[in-house]
């Protein structure tokens, strides 16, 4: 065939339909690599989450690789400790303790994790770049990429930044199917990224 490999977003909270897509690809001899497996990477907001040597990155990696149709995981790593952490996840089966940790995390971030579905963004009368702003805030808060995030935010045309969100009715909140406080998060992101 024409394609030998593709990459898709996949995590343990959303994208349930991805498994079927990956399976259909595998049946046609197409390999799948996945990324964004950590579902927002917000574990530092939940200090009791990672116990007994378990880590969210390792559990999420094992979860993704437990799907026989997933060939590889793409993960951002910025130091050797992270490389060791991810390598420690490979070749080991996903255990019950990890499944339980992933479920606790999923429950904790359900209304905090942006799935980038775009529904809230389309409800915004000011055309604020909600998905981009959420992504840059995530990079700032959870990936240690403060300078990059601020640069990226500064590249958004001013009228699409969150500078007006404080005076808004919050159509984005009402539109979010996951109950996120989108407006509040955008205001916080604006303060953080300017």
Predicted ranges, named:
Residues 1-119, 123-128, 132-135, 142-157, ...:
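Beta/alpha (TIM)-barrel catalytic core signal, keyed to glycine-rich beta->alpha loops juxtaposed to Asp/Glu
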Residues 105, 136, 188, 192:
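Residues that form generic nucleotide/phosphate-binding pockets
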Residues 143-194:
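Flanking helices and flexible, charged tails adjoining ferredoxin-like Fe-S electron-transfer domains
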């Amino acid at each position: 065939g024409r394609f030998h490999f593709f990459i898709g977003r996949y995590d343990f909270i959303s994208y349930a339909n991805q498994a079927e897509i990956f399976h259909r690809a595998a049946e046609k001899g197409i390999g799948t690599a996945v990324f964004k497996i950590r579902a927002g990477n917000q574990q530092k907001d939940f200090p009791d989450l990672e116990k007994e040597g378990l880590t969210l990155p390792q559990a999420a990696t094992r979860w993704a690789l437990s799907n026989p149709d997933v060939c590889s995981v793409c993960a951002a790593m910025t130091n050797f400790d992270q490389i060791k952490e991810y390598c420690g996840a490979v070749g080991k089966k996903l255990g019950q303790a990890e499944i339980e940790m992933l479920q606790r995390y999923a429950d904790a971030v359900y209304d905090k994790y942006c799935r980038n579905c775009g529904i809230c963004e389309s409800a915004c009368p000011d055309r604020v770049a909600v998905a981009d702003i959420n992504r840059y805030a995530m990079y700032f808060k959870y990936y240690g990429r403060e300078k990059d995030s601020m640069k990226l935010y500064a590249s958004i045309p001013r009228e699409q930044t969150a500078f007006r969100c404080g005076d808004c009715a919050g159509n984005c909140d009402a539109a979010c199917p996951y109950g996120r406080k989108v407006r509040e998060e955008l205001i916080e992101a604006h303060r953080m990224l300017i």
